[in-house]
Amino acid sequence: MTTPPGTLPVDDSAVHTVREIAQQPALWREVDRIVGASREALDAFLDPLVARGDLRVVLTGAGTSAFAGQVLQPSLARHLGRRVDAVPTTDLVADPRGCLAEDLPTLLVSFARSGDSPESVAATALADQVLSEVHHLVITCNEQGRLAREHTRRPRSHVLLMPAASNDRGFAMTSSFTCMTLAALLALGKDARDGVAERLARAAESIIEDGAADRTAGALVDRAPERIVFLGSGPLKGLAEESALKVLELTGGTLMAVAESSLGFRHGPKAVLNERSVAVVYVSNDPYTRRYDHDIVAELRGNLPVGSVVAVSAESGAGTEGADAWPLPGLGDVEDAALALPAVVYAQLIALRASQARGLRPDNPFPSGEVNRVVQGVTLHSLND
């Protein structure tokens, strides 16, 4: 294993995954430029829709792409002052009449790394079939993907392409997730535009480049946990879901990973804890919400051995005593949907190191093909049969 200056340690089992984690700050700056250059066309497409009082916004994707919607939903609902729902494509395809029961004018925001997953195109087609009026904002990392090709130059569609490098070659979505999430926040959350991408990039660079985060993630993995719990509130619950999925994917399902909200964890999911568990709590920047995050940190301190509870936080001081504090420097005033982007780097590093500790190859933890980078094996059925 080598350690090039200013980067993460890398070996041939994780060439793509390491590069794709490390490239995120640079790609976020590129996303900011892309959205800025597309601003006139984006506003021409979005502003008349958002001005309509009856518009419903639906954020959709599968797996990690669905969690992008979950991170964004509370924030965009506030920014837009209207109903915003996060509905996975996997739900929408299985039950389109239920997910789209109200025949309202709808903006369907589709997130897709490749755009070639069976549900990606099917979800947009079913929305067209079920609803009287639907408009599509497609945010994807693959210009050649079927989703991008089918919606390019359609009159009610706008395709926003991410940097080519964000079409992750590693098994797990890393830079694709953060780039698409940032792009949607910049495109739709107008109050979040000014300078936020640069601030997030600088924070992530400080996490990645000094090596401390990688060492602390490695130290957590060295505890040989049997179970890992990720908790967060509001947008950070979506981040907790994405974090747990990263660990499950890169460890080939050998490390049990659970996600919940800080309040919801007590209502049954807390049963997962044993003496070989570790917990990561994402602490909200909202002064009201983070009280609940502080409460669960304090409770977990009493349940788990010293060193087993991590608080990922932009704040310093009260509320996280007794927990290992993993910082998000200079971001104490940003909204939680934006905070999620540098915060997820910690989960990506945990997943990477846990995978390697198990002798797996993070770039392909399922060499026999039990789980695929682009989902296979889905049979799509006609709605009218």
Curated annotation (Swiss-Prot):
Any Pfam family hit: SIS
Reaction catalysed by this enzyme: D-galactosamine 6-phosphate + H2O = D-tagatopyranose 1-phosphate + NH4(+)
InterPro entries: GatZ_KbaZ_carbometab, GlmS/AgaS_SIS, SIS_AgaS, SIS_dom, SIS_dom_sf, Sugar_isomerase_AgaS
Gene3D superfamilies: Glucose-6-phosphate isomerase like protein, domain 1
A single MF term (Gene Ontology): hydrolase activity
PROSITE patterns in UniProt: SIS (PS51464)
Keywords carried by this UniProt record: Carbohydrate metabolism, Hydrolase, Repeat
E.C. code: 3.5.99.-
GO biological process, one term: carbohydrate derivative metabolic process
One GO cellular component term: plasma membrane
SUPFAM superfamilies: SIS domain
Domain spans labelled SIS: 46-206, 217-365
Source organism superkingdom: Bacteria
Role of this protein: Catalyzes the isomerization-deamination of galactosamine 6-phosphate to form tagatofuranose 6-phosphate and ammonium ion.
Family according to the record: Belongs to the SIS family. AgaS subfamily.
Protein name stated in the entry: Putative D-galactosamine-6-phosphate deaminase AgaS
Originating species: Streptomyces coelicolor (strain ATCC BAA-471 / A3(2) / M145)
UniProt gene name: agaS
